[in-house]
Structures are given as structure tokens and as C-alpha cells.
Design a protein with these regions (language model features):
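Conserved HGGG/HGGXW glycine-rich cap/lid loop of the alpha/beta-hydrolase fold
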Residues: 10-62
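Active-site loop/oxyanion-hole signature of alpha/beta-hydrolase fold enzymes
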Residues: 39, 47, 54-93, 260-261
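Gly/Ala-rich beta-loop-alpha elbow adjacent to hydrolase catalytic centers
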Residues: 94, 98, 102
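Flexible "cap/lid" loop of the alpha/beta hydrolase fold
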Residues: 103-107, 114-154
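Conserved alpha/beta-hydrolase catalytic His-Asp/Glu region
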Residues: 132, 146-207
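Short beta-strand/loop motif that positions the catalytic acidic residue
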Residues: 209, 215-217
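Acidic catalytic loop of the alpha/beta-hydrolase fold
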Residues: 220-224
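Catalytic active-site module of serine/aspartate enzymes centered on a nucleophile-bearing elbow/loop
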Residues: 239-268
Length: 268
């Protein structure tokens, strides 16, 4: 069910199914992203006895655009959203750029979360020795001019292992969420200045997270994710890391059944 609620002065749209312990899903930040990325996941979680919630982050989907476009604002917004829906604690699922946001908010507010599931987050993996990033950074996948259906196809091609799952319906949905205020927000995010914190890389702080933690990736995800997962496991053997074969960055969509099964097993 689609609902709206006021959070930090912004009309915030969210999808909610089921009743029980809350599980909150955070979508990524590429052009066209929204809570609808979890349409293949919410029913399974609701059916397993959870209150499954995915919300459009500020500047995405049907949620108002914010004044502050930095990812750090959207990170703090997570706790404000939990307060608004009367969830004192929740399991948190963060996809892509939101995996890093989820890790940071769990470090900052450990008592607010029961479990942490980081999905396809390049920002929580170590770099391979001698390698530099290639392609657009997380949250920068998009266009500099008003996007077209073909632009959406190019973005989705980079996110799917099985290209046959990229339907016209999916492309049209993503395009709809890319236009108007959402395209304005995408451009504003690309220009936003993030706080320069320096310090310890996020992947070195994962061991500080005090709640059960699972890192989950499509085995064919971009950015050498599988190799970087292996490197992280070597560096931090206690971390739980799983790969789903025949899936890329949008593992939540193209391998939804396997993702749901793995995530629910972790939560229970």
C-alpha cells in the first residue's frame, strides 16, 4: 500500500506491506531509483511476518525535494523516518549507495537497529590493490540532459546480468521517476558537497557494527564486487558475506526469490 507522511518537513511517500517487526528498505541513488525497486521483495517479507517498508528518499520518487542534497542528509533522514512511523527499532536493508548510508547510521545510532543488510554497496568494500574506480560512482548513474527511455535502458544494462529481464514496463517506470523534480534533484546531488570527514574507510569500520550484519551481492555485480568481497573476507574473516550467482547490481530485482530467501533466513 502506498502512503504519505511528513518527515522533517517533507511529504514522504512510502510503500508498506504486512505487520510485525519492521524492516525498512533503502533504495539506491541512480537516476530513476525509488522505493519501487523493492516491489519484488516487500510481499515476501510481509508474508514472512514482517512489516516491510520502502520509502522514496528525499529527492526521489514521489517524495519532496530537500534543501540539502548531500547523502549525509539522507543518512540522518533514516532515523527521522523511523520516528515518523513509530518504529523504535528496525532491521535495515540498504542497496547500492544506501548500503553505505545504512552502515553509517547504524554506527551512529546502534540502538535503533536490529539487523543490517548491505546489498550491492561498492562503498563498503575495499579497493583492489593497484585498481582505481571505473565508470560512474554510486549515485551518479544518469544523464546531464533530460533522460529518455533509451537512457534508462543503458543504465539498466549496467545493472542487470540477465538483460532479458529489462522490460519496457520497468524502463517506463524508471523513466517516470527520472523526470521533472527528480531530474532536478539528480543534477543537484551531482553538485552537492559532502562533508570531508577523512578518517577510517567505512569498510574498516564494519566490524564496529553491533547488530547482526550481512553483506550480499550479485556475483556478477560491477566494479569487481566479487573479488573485493573476497578481499574483505580475507581482511575481516568474521564478516558474513554472500554472493548470489547469475545476478548483477539489481540483485534485489533479477534474483528476487534468492535474495528474499537469503535475507529472510538472515533476519530469522
Amino acid at each position: 500500500m502506498e502512503r504519505t507522511i511528513q518527515v522533517d518537513g517533507l511529504k514522504t511517500c512510502y510503500l508498506e506491506e504486512g505487520a510485525g517487526a519492521p524492516v525498512v528498505f533503502l533504495h539506491g541513488a541512480s537516476l530513476g531509483s525509488s522505493a519501487r525497486a523493492f516491489e519484488r521483495n516487500l510481499p515476501a517479507f510481509a508474508g514472512a511476518g514482517f512489516r516491510a517498508i520502502a520509502y522514496d528518499q528525499p529527492g526521489f520518487g514521489l517524495t519532496d525535494n530537500p534543501i540539502d542534497y548531500a547523502a549525509s542528509y539522507r543518512t540522518q533522514f533514516i532515523v527521522k523516518f523511523l520516528d515518523a512511523i513509530d518504529a523504535s527499532r528496525a532491521a535495515l536493508v540498504g542497496h547500492s549507495q544506501a548500503a553505505g548510508m545504512a552502515a553509517r547510521v547504524a554506527l551512529q545510532h546502534p540502538t535503533r537497529f536490529t539487523h543490517l543488510l548491505l546489498v550491492g554497496g561498492g562503498g563498503v568494500l575495499p579497493p583492489l590493490p593497484g585498481k582505481t574506480g571505473g565508470g560512474p560512482a554510486e549515485g551518479q548513474e544518469g544523464t546531464s540532459t533530460t533522460p529518455t527511455l533509451e537512457d534508462m535502458r543503458k543504465i539498466m544494462d549496467n545493472n542487470f546480468f540477465n538483460k532479458g529481464l529489462i522490460t519496457t514496463e520497468l524502463l517506463e517506470q524508471r523513466l517516470k521517476m527520472s523526470l521533472g523534480k527528480n531530474f532536478d534533484a539528480f543534477i543537484a546531488r551531482s553538485r552537492a558537497r559532502e562533508p570531508q570527514g577523512g578518517g577510517v574507510p567505512l569498510y574498516q569500520r564494519l566490524k564496529e557494527i553491533s547488530v547482526p550484519l550481512l553483506l550480499l551481492y550479485g556475483k556478477q555485480d560491477r566494479g569487481s564486487a566479487a573479488q573485493r568481497c573476497a578481499l574483505l573476507k580475507e581482511q575481516e574473516p568474521s564478516l558474513r558475506i554472500e554472493l548470489i550467482d547469475n545476478a548483477a547490481h539489481l540483485v534485489i530485482w533479477e534474483a528476487a526469490d534468492k535474495f528474499n530467501e537469503t535475507a529472510l533466513r538472515f533476519l530469522k
